[in-house]
Amino acid sequence: MKFVIITGLSGAGKSQTVKSMEDFGFYCVDNLPPALIPKFAELCHQSQGVISRAALVIDIRGGMFFDDLFESLKELEHLGHQYEILFLDADDEVLMKRFKETRRSHPLNVDGSIENGITRERELLQELKDRASHIIHTTKLIPAQLKEELRNIYVEGNQMNNLMISIASFGFKHGIPLDSDLVFDVRFLPNPFYIEELKDFTGNDVKVRNYVMNSPISVEFSNKLHDIVSFLIPHYVQEGKNQLVISIGCTGGRHRSVTIAHVLYHQLKDKGHRVTLSHRDSGETRERKKES
């Protein structure tokens, strides 16, 4: 079991960090009293692998409970769990500006001075900062850049595998799926609907797929579609996107769109991407899924 203790200056980006860590598959808890860390670790252990990575935000909002942190970390280590400390920092001027923009008061703002609150907080957190495994300065980082910094630290292996690609076929006469990121119209391809022996089948049947893909236009389009999607994927990942919904439509959503969606699904699956396939309007309930 791996724990990441997220801490740092108020206004330095801890809330944004939690959102990113959740996207990376961490179970996140904000403002957990430090004394409860060992108990939380025990609960995670009882989950039998359901929770394998957790990120806990611990900061001076805990007040008097914050003093229990180092003792709790020592106990966590004694229980055989790994942990590391992620410390978020930023220039005082930037922190003050962020507080003013959000119109929030500093947690240690007892005399009306944000600056004094930041100074006091730095003093209280110095030992924790000295023990940090990673320190990220967010002064010049926008949220997407912060997420990329976190990705470089906490995401192992092929970053493309963090993007879930959902491919869905549909029929335009039933409406475009509202959650689509990319929509492709394949109504220009040969239509099996007008072939008597094929009209009652769908693109999930080999003979329908063979009919559609027997056209050079279909082959060329499917290859170009794969090329454009392959080009876009790393750029979406770089922007921090975690899910990509590709909708492919024909008139009724039973033949051409199902066929092209099927082809694209297998092209991306063979490249090792996490991809799911569904057919909204095919009249069938089957759905193929693959995560790798």
From Swiss-Prot:
- Identify the keywords attached in UniProt to this record, alphabetized: ATP-binding, GTP-binding, Nucleotide-binding
Query: Is the GTP-binding keyword given for this protein?
Result: yes
- Output one GO MF annotation: GTP binding
Query: Which Gene3D superfamilies does the record cross-reference, listed alphabetically?
Result: P-loop containing nucleotide triphosphate hydrolases
Q: What does this protein do?
A: Displays ATPase and GTPase activities.
Assigned protein family: Belongs to the RapZ-like family.
**What's the name of the protein?**
Nucleotide-binding protein Amet_4092
